[in-house]
Curated annotation (Swiss-Prot):
A cellular component term, taken from the record's GO annotations: nucleus
Record-given protein name: Zinc finger protein 14
SUPFAM superfamilies: beta-beta-alpha zinc fingers, KRAB domain (Kruppel-associated box)
Domain of life of the organism encoding this protein: Eukaryota
Lineage: Eukaryota, Metazoa, Chordata, Craniata, Vertebrata
Domain KRAB: 4-76
Family per similarity comment: Belongs to the krueppel C2H2-type zinc-finger protein family.
Family annotation (Pfam families): KRAB (PF01352), zf-C2H2 (PF00096), zf-C2H2_6 (PF13912)
Species this protein is from: Homo sapiens
Keywords: DNA-binding, Metal-binding, Nucleus, Repeat, Transcription, Transcription regulation, Zinc, Zinc-finger
Residues in C2H2-type zinc fingers: 103-125, 141-163, 169-191, 197-217, 223-245, 251-273, 279-301, 307-329, 335-357, 363-385, 391-413, 419-441, 447-469, 475-497, 503-525, 531-553, 559-581, 587-609, 615-637
């Protein structure tokens, strides 16, 4: 005859059935289950349950009462009167089915599913009989390091790991190790994306039971702060809040000494030292130190913009961007700098500004040593070294290093300009552009250079100006090694290698690398030459051309070569001259590889491959590769000696 187990004789209720029982019926159920369990124990039935934790025995609980109590609690909710509607749907399997073995032998390292199995195995090391081993386990142990006393040897051995630093449970995915099995098991869920605790009311899922408990829809907030009256659902949140009044920061980083009021902030901070990035994107492989950063990054792939403005319908990836945008409609600037009184529409902008007064720049680039006031500024700067461009335009698939650059580019497709100047009515694609424009009305220049006293309307112009003093050129071309002060100059230079000409003339179809070149070209079609020389009456298409021309009258040559003393009217001719000293030949023929000092020279040379001869003599029809050869030929018709 097969042995009888507790499951064979136990009566099980569903949660719905349990909710229908009154208190007397539930009490009767507990009494019957206790009696059943007692009878099985008297018959010699051994109860081996992996969920009976050692700490229950340490507290002196009667095993029979504990088993029935736990069985009943699984139906009626928590000890605090939790209703069945607040109980989670637990979707995680027990160790028996997953093959997990959380109980480890401290002698040989062998793992076991059940603690009772570990107990039996331990006797093979100690040589003790069952009753003797039970007595051995119950002998009190005292930790020499902190003086803490333990009722059981295995509890003492676990505690010892906190002093020795032994972490036997290591994550196979990221290598992180843990002292105890339970935290290790919870950590594994962050990789698997497993969220076993589901709220029945709203369907939201959680990795940890504590998070689920905090989420409960009861509306009860039993923990109230006596100082400010704020109430909290859970005791831990209440304790953390109290520290905002006391200023207590009990969690201190051993590496840098920075202290935190919350253990989660402390653990997050530690990753800045260890470089740990446990959250990895499955689409692009990029890893993140923080779960919040990982979730925000996923939106760049999905295109999700969960924060929508009710005023204008504009949607945002991030809540911070949304909050900053909402203030634009109200015009409010509630955050004021204590030093200079300047007001800002976001607390973040105010904090960044305050650092301009104290000069604090705690974030340093490991490659070039440049320091930044904010970690996000450092991360954005690092992309200038790596060339990373994570933001892609869905319409033309062009990629960008910065989300702001992508948004700016997207307006070229939509033409959207939602930010309007209240004084002159001019509209802009971005709030930052509007702010810069507004300063043209009030002449405000809040950014002043400490070295030369020059002031600027915009912080970006100010930072670029500072480089003229430091000589810093952070943007380097990977193809030719040329470096630039401005990112815009660097991007324009890249087109000399790629041949990209995104600006097209609508009248003749000619394309240009730069928007300024297109604007100048368009004047050729209109014939309009608005800039006239006052001395000789000669007219020009561009203001830059007339300035250069005027120097032929004044004799001014502001650009002088330091090596040979020769002076030039224009900066372009001066730079070309410098190449005669340096030997630099930045322009290379794509077909034969021959290098040239000047872009005009490489264009003329390329015609020797294509056969193009754009300069044709009207008198004899002979064509030429270059304008200089054509002008020499024309003299033969005029009778000039060449």
């Amino acid at each position: 005859m097969d042995s009888v187990s507790f499951e064979d004789v136990a009566v099980n209720f569903t949660l719905e059935e349990w909710a229908l029982l009154d208190s007397s019926q539930k009490k009767l159920y507990e009494d019957v289950m206790q009696e059943t369990f007692k009878n099985l124990v008297c018959l010699g039935k051994k109860w081996e349950d992996q969920d009976i934790e050692d700490d229950h025995r340490n507290q002196g609980k009667n095993r029979r009462c504990h088993m029935v109590e736990r069985l009943c609690e699984s139906r009626r909710g928590s000890k605090c009167g939790e209703t069945t509607s607040q109980m989670p749907n637990v979707n995680i399997n027990k160790e028996t089915f997953t093959g997990a073995k959380p109980h480890e032998c401290s002698f040989c390292g062998r793992d076991f599913i059940h603690h009772s199995s570990l107990n039996r195995h331990m006797r093979s090391h100690t040589g003790q009989k069952p009753n003797e081993y039970q007595e051995y386990e119950k002998q009190p142990c005292k930790c020499k390091a902190v003086g803490k006393t333990f009722s059981y040897h295995h509890c003492f051995r676990k505690h010892e790991r906190t002093h020795t630093g032994v972490k036997p449970y290591e994550c196979k995915q990221c290598g992180k190790a843990f002292i105890y099995y339970q935290p290790f098991q919870r950590h594994e869920r962050t990789h698997a994306g497993q969220k076993p605790y589901e709220c029945k009311q709203c369907g939201k899922t959680f990795i940890y039971y504590q998070s689920f408990q905090k989420h409960a829809h009861t509306g009860k907030k039993p923990y109230e702060c006596k100082q400010c009256g704020k109430a909290f659902i859970c005791y831990q949140s209440f304790q953390r809040h109290k520290r905002t009044h006391t200023g207590e920061k009990p969690y201190e980083c051993k590496q840098c000494g920075k202290a935190f009021s919350c253990p989660t902030y402390f653990r997050t901070h530690e990753r800045t030292h260890t470089g740990e990035k446990p959250y990895k994107c499955k689409e692009c492989g990029k890893a993140f130190s923080f779960l919040s950063s990982f979730r925000r990054h996923k939106r760049t792939h999905s295109g999700e913009k969960p924060y929508e403005c009710k005023e204008c319908g504009k949607a945002f990836f991030y809540s911070a961007s949304f909050r900053a945008h909402v203030i634009i409609h109200t015009g409010a600037r509630p955050y004021k700098c204590k030093e200079c009184g300047k007001a800002f529409n976001s607390s973040n902008s105010c904090r960044v500004h305050e650092r301009t007064h104290i000069g604090e720049k705690p974030y340093e680039c490991k490659r070039c040593g440049k320091s930044f006031s904010w970690s996000i500024s450092l991360r954005l700067h690092e992309r200038t070294h790596t060339g990373e461009k994570p933001y892609e335009c869905k319409q033309c698939h062009k990629t960008f290093s910065f989300s702001s650059s992508l948004r700016e580019h997207e307006t070229t497709h939509t033409g959207e300009k939602p930010y309007e100047c209240k004084q002159c009515g001019k509209t802009f694609s971005f709030s930052s552009s509007l702010q810069r424009h507004e300063r043209t009305h009030n002449a405000e220049k809040p950014y002043e250079c400490k070295q030369c006293g020059k002031a600027f309307r915009c912080s970006s112009y100010f930072r670029i100006h500072e480089r003229s003093h430091t000589g810093e050129k952070p943007y380097e071309c990977k193809q030719c090694g040329k470096v630039f002060i401005r990112s815009s100059s660097f991007r324009l230079h890249e087109r000399t290698h790629t041949g990209e000409k995104p600006y097209e003339c609508k009248l003749c179809g000619k394309t240009f690398s730069f928007s300024s070149s297109l604007r100048e070209h368009e004047k050729i079609h209109t014939g309009n030459k608005p800039f006239e020389c006052k001395q000789c009456g000669k007219a020009f298409l561009r203001s830059s051309q007339i300035r250069l021309h005027e120097r032929t009258h004044t004799g001014e040559k502001p650009y002088q070569c330091k090596q040979c003393g020769k002076a030039f009217i224009s900066s372009s001719k001066f730079r070309m001259h410098e190449r005669t000293h340096t030997g630099e030949k930045p322009y290379r023929c794509k077909q034969c590889g021959k290098a040239f000092r000047f872009s005009s020279s490489v264009r003329i040379h390329e015609r020797s491959h294509t056969g193009e001869k754009p300069y044709e003599c009207k008198q004899c029809g002979k064509a030429f590769i270059s304008s200089s050869h054509f002008r020499l030929h024309e003299r033969t018709h005029m009778g000039e000696k060449v």
